[in-house]
Amino acid sequence: MVKEKKKADKKGEKSARSPSSLSDNLDFSKQDGNTTRQEMSPAGVPLLGMQLNEVKPKKDRQNVQQNEDASQYEESILTKLIVESYEGEKVRGLYEGEGFAAFQGGCTYRGMFSEGLMHGQGTYIWADGLKYEGDFVKNVPMNHGVYTWPDGSMYEGEVVNGMRNGFGMFKCSTQPVSYIGHWCNGKRHGKGSIYYNQEGTCWYEGDWVQNIKKGWGIRCYKSGNIYEGQWEDNMRHGEGRMRWLTTNEEYTGRWERGIQNGFGTHTWFLKRIRSSQYPLRNEYIGEFVNGYRHGRGKFYYASGAMYDGEWVSNKKHGMGRLTFKNGRVYEGAFSNDHIAGFPDLEVEFISCLDLSSGVAPRLSRSAELIRKLDGSESHSVLGSSIELDLNLLLDMYPETVQPEEKKQVEYAVLRNITELRRIYSFYSSLGCGHSLDNTFLMTKLHFWRFLKDCKFHHHKLTLADMDRILSANNDIPVEEIHSPFTTILLRTFLNYLLHLAYHIYHEEFQKRSPSLFLCFTKLMTENIRPNACQIKGNLFREQQRTLYSMSYMNKCWEIYLAYCRPSAAPPHEPTMKMRHFLWMLKDFKMINKELTAATFMEVIAEDNRFIYDGIDSNFEPELVFLEFFEALLSFAFICVTDQMTKSYTNVPADDVSGNKHETIYTILNQDAQNKSPSAVMSHESDAAHSDSARSSSSKLELSPDVNKIRKSEPKIKKSVSHERVSKMNFKLTGKGITFFSSESKKYERPKDDREEEFNTWVNNTYVFFVNTLFHAYKREEAIKEKIRADRLRSTAQAQQRKMEDDELEARLNIFILREEEAKRHDYEVDITVLKEPADVSSSHLILDPPKEDVTVSPSSKTITSKKKKK
């Protein structure tokens, strides 16, 4: 029998320290383990050519841990447990089953006992108020349990030998701090997340080593700034990216003890003003030392200028190359952020760099000097903002007339530049939402529409032919010659017009001078002025329909590429002929009584009189994607009947991939996103065209997607894309979805018949693309995939059969060889057997000695004499 007061099993002497508190090396929202520098961005953007008075980056003034160890949450020790009283069952003098024990010193336990030990579920309360509820194994807290401290702090999770070990959650009551993740020996260790406020806006998620942030993790600060990367000793250390959302900055690169050190990229995102045409950012790519731009690096300015050279403490110092936005270059020494030797040029350089208009700067002696430094002196009447590439065209003329040809055609462009800018702006804005800076970038899709509106294709040239002509003058990859996503700057647009003018009219004016001037003038007179900005076709005719049609563009481009074939003309890029288009529809089983071959020809030839005259058809012309897509939009209204749309009166907005309501730049941005390594975009800005080559990769941001419609709540909703640009509203009617631009609120609502017409068009378009075209394409691709699989399987089976046949043939050959070998062996044995008697007799003849005269015995004589007597 065990006495009431006895010493418990020595296993009860095992320590069971409580979980160390979150204040063990924890960083709170206001402090992050090293300095207040943690959320500060590095030095600001320098002004080019002028000394920068910028705030010096704050270094680590102290690397002391915060006062985070003020209050500790540690386990009390299960000391030598002397039982003062016990209430419960006993078996053979040992505590067994459920009971209550009070220990010497004020600790208590209520729960399960086994063989005199705390074993199973129970609650242990220390004298200081610390409580453990959970599993016990032989007097030791084990497996899963809950620690509760006197101040209300709590841990729930896995416990090993009384220590937090495994996965668990800790919540501090005195401060809004909580941790959920892995533990080891009472410390945060492994993967875990810590939250520094109740709102959950300040947190760290990542790797821990012994209560220290070490490894890879994400830190979100209360201000919204975010760091994602490597950590060491609670500080940013290694490769990582910091985004200062409050100041629209971003740094990606090397860190050392919380500060930029090593190679990295720092970007300052800008908000552009109305009518600006600059890129979206200033960007530095190069070396950093203690948060400063120091060493070798490149700085790309928002104006289009660029400095490549040496830096010292955020200042241009040493040898460098400065390229202005107009293409002029200075290469030489810099001192303390100034161009060495030319201090009087600073103000003029800055004003030249920051010009926001297309007007050429007033030339002075110093500006002319800079032009001559790099040998780029130019006398173009268009100024430095627009550079026409006329070398290939001028090579068509004798050298003696080239200067005059160039001068006259530049004068012609200058006289029409205002109108050409307006045309460029008009077409580049088609299918786009509202732009914050009123600037749009033309794409090949817009350019094709411009060419068709101005009837360029009426001069025995298809759009595909024009693409090949223009690509021959540029280093364009073969697969991108007919891409609708290719962007076209204003100067490129002007160059394209000059090249097309020459190819269309040069035979007419080849004997007159200045020939190129006359070609361009006639193009403006007969093609562009009478027809530009008069939209034809059915893609860009109405803004609402354009925005909705763009949701199907990506999938249609995929289908177009799938059915292209190499062109017969160099460079043999993939194109689609009309006959290929018709064959595709036939394969899709879409040629029927509604859409006949004759109807197909009428739609294709709607704005091209040379393809079909009502009797004869020409199926050889190639189609670019614009013609392909517009034809599909026309087929949608022809193929889909009212009966087919009855079951689709409520069109889901995002039922299938690609069926989302977006602007053209959503589509273009998605396609070009991977092509532009420097396309780091601001979340609150749109892209624009710029004379700088760096801006050519920029795109307008995403437009809003359309949310799913609740049939029971026909109300107006709004959806905003993650890029926070234009908005789109819609409402549900009895016949489908009606879409509105958010800007149309200030106008009068459409009439009922207009709404009805638009709803019918939306339904027809949805049914045609989603339920007919895309479904047929998917089915056809599945069939092709099955055919490919069958061919592969047949090939594999044929190879297997061939291998088996070869193996069988080899075995037969081996068998035949063995039989022949056996026969040959038997034959040799027979020959040997037949030869043996002869060999034996011959051997006897040879080996026997010569016989002597025979001596007749007397008996033999007697026998002979007897025969004679008879």
UniProtKB/Swiss-Prot annotation:
**Localized where?**
Cytoplasm, Cytoskeleton, Cilium axoneme; Cell projection, Cilium; Cell projection, Cilium, Flagellum
Q: What is this protein identified as?
A: Radial spoke head 10 homolog B2
Query: Which InterPro entries does the entry link to?
Result: MORN (IPR003409)
Principal localisation: cytoplasm
- Give me the MORN repeat coordinates as residue ranges: 86-108, 109-131, 132-154, 155-177, 179-201, 204-226, 227-249, 251-273, 284-306, 307-329
GO terms for CC? 9+2 motile cilium; cilium; cytoplasm; cytoskeleton; sperm flagellum
Q: What does the UniProt record say this protein does?
A: May function as part of the axonemal radial spoke complex 3 (RS3). Radial spoke complexes are important for ciliary motility.
- The SS bond pairs are none
**Annotated organism of origin:** Homo sapiens (Human)
